[in-house]
Amino acid sequence: MYDNLKSLGITQPEDVDRYSLRQEANNDILKIYFRKDKGEFFAKSVKFKYPRQRKTVVADNAGHGYKEINEINPNLRYVIDELDQLCKRDQVEVDLKRKILDDLRHLESVVTNKIAEIEADLEKLTSGR
């Protein structure tokens, strides 16, 4: 699993925290950031440069003109897919934690309101005597 990342020398893909991608001239620059260890001020990162792929395509439907376009390198596309899987997994875990906390707060509110309702009913019973 994560063969493309491992081919880049990333031996522990689970340590990837996030990544950034930018275009610089005819290259795409991929920067991968790793989780910080305790006591570190800055996250470790590695940078990779991928040349953009050049293609000549038909410029119009009549087939008279051609134009040159630049596309993302296919290898980079595979690496980004793996990075998205890793980063999305972390987001899913955070979302699940947030959902559980929201459910817990809602349950707390419901129980608090129910206790107040029962206490009010008890008060009615005791004051009615």
Swiss-Prot record:
State one Pfam family annotation.
Answer: DUF3461
Q: Where is the signal peptide?
A: none
The similarity annotation says: Belongs to the UPF0325 family.
NCBIfam families from the xrefs? Answer: PRK13677.1
This one is known as UPF0325 protein YE3288
